[in-house]
Amino acid sequence: MIRTTLCFASVLALQVALAGTAGAAETAKAVLSDPDGKEIGTVTLTAVPTGVLLNAELTAFPEGTHAFHIHGTGKCEPPSFKSAGGHFNPEEDRHGLENPAGPHSGDMPNIHVPANGKLHIEMMNQMVSLPGLLEGEGTAIVVHKKGDDYISNPAGDAGPRIACGVINE
């Protein structure tokens, strides 16, 4: 009963927070493609008072742990996706959620894809704003082959980029 009440209270608090931005809520979307150009997921980004809420629907992803980052350039040229640049890092912090001199604004937790290749995730990034992600050269969501170790510079030893999507209004 207590667990149910706490769960309901958490959902209600999130709905109230999002309702406070209704009408004024800004959203953006990134369509993720693999190195062959096949669409394999979408990420919807919603501005909330404390940052950006990311809601991802992934399909046809390889099983395993993968780094999931915001990169600093809004380009996704296959097959390497190097055109997306490094992690979004306007404050020029060190890389890594576990780094005392970090993290980059684009650092986010790893994702864990099951054997069927499908995953729904929601996560908050309190280090970014939607207008900040859309200005200048824009930004992109990038998924790496391996998980981020949360400390190595410059990118967490996460391996090659396996998916990329430009963040657009």
Task: Go through the PLM ranges and name each one.
Residues 1-2:
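N-terminal secretory signal peptides that target proteins for export/translocation
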Residues 20-169:
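N-terminal leader/targeting pre-sequences
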